[in-house]
Structures are given as structure tokens and as C-alpha cells.
Curated annotation (Swiss-Prot):
It is found in: Secreted. This is Delta-hexatoxin-Mg1b. The presence of a 'disulfide through disulfide knot' structurally defines this protein as a knottin. Expressed by the venom gland. Keywords: Disulfide bond, Ion channel impairing toxin, Knottin, Neurotoxin, Secreted, Signal, Toxin, Voltage-gated sodium channel impairing toxin. It comes from Macrothele gigas. GO terms for molecular function: sodium channel inhibitor activity; toxin activity. Belongs to the neurotoxin 06 (delta-actx) family. It holds the Pfam family Atracotoxin.
Length: 70
């Protein structure tokens, strides 16, 4: 019985990790990084999410500078 439980747990954790990697990549709304526009903040939120393994970041560093109002 314990062998069966262990096998089921291993299968569940592998499926969970796979589904987490396949989920839609988007900007995380984890923190408000600046007091300007969402376009300015969104790349930083993506970078935060990418750093924490929650998402990939489709924006480049240059996007941060070009999308922020002066």
C-alpha cells in the first residue's frame, strides 16, 4: 500500500509541475513597482514573477524605459 501511495504522490507532483510550466504566461500583479502607468509597471512585475519562477518575461529591459512616461 505504501508503495502505491508513493507512486501516486510522485505522479501528482510531476503533473503539477508540468501544468505550472504550461499555464499561460502573463504579467503578474504581485506588487505595484512604480507610481506611473501600468505599461511602466508591467515589465517589472513580469521580471519579479520570472525571478520567482511564476512566469516568463516577454518584455525586454528596453521596454521598461520606452514605455514609461517621461
Amino acid at each position: 500500500m505504501k508503495i502505491l501511495e508513493k507512486a501516486l504522490l510522485e505522479n501528482d507532483s510531476a503533473a503539477e509541475e508540468e501544468s505550472r510550466n504550461l499555464r499561460t504566461k502573463r504579467c503578474a500583479r504581485k506588487r505595484a513597482w512604480c507610481e506611473k502607468t501600468e505599461n511602466c509597471c508591467c515589465p517589472m512585475k513580469c521580471i519579479y514573477a520570472w525571478y520567482n519562477g511564476q512566469s516568463s518575461c516577454d518584455h525586454t529591459i528596453s521596454t521598461i524605459w520606452t514605455s514609461c512616461p517621461k
